[in-house]
Amino acid sequence: TRRDFLRKGAFAGLGMLTMSELAKAVVSKQNGNVSPKIKLEKDSVILFQGDSITDMFRKYDCNQCNTPEQMGMGYALFAASTLLSDYPDKQLKIYNRGVGGNKVYQLRDRWELDTLAIQPDVLSILIGVNDFWHILMGNYKGSLGIYERDLQDLLHYTKEKLPNVQ
């Protein structure tokens, strides 16, 4: 429908804006090399994790890396396409495990299977829209403090389990 088209177009536009900032922060080129902030080795595993902005209509039943179906239609797809095109010799393995509607505690609930089991070398997390939005809608009793605490706890837990993750 027209409404679906407009909704998807708005999300894709937001994803493209987000991707450009993510690309600047995560992967930048300096004389043809990857920025020292993120080191991509041969066979590096990259994981995009988060809520609907990451999800962007990905197919949940597709678990293969580097496929458009599991990348969705947002910034994860654009970033993966760029990385795979720019660094074909690195044979990167890129996954998207974003789930629409998720808040930080829901991300934590699926962390073992959807993050730690993948063993990413590089992890990108984009989460927080629903933590705020659902408070405004009266569907969630969270707060900024809960969001910050839950996210910090998740990051610390991840570094304990995957000490070399970037």
Give names to the regions the model predicted.
Residues F78-K93, Q106-Q166:
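Alpha-helical cap/lid subdomain in secreted, periplasmic
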Residues S52-D55, V99-V104, V129-H134:
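Solvent-exposed loop/turn segments at secondary-structure junctions
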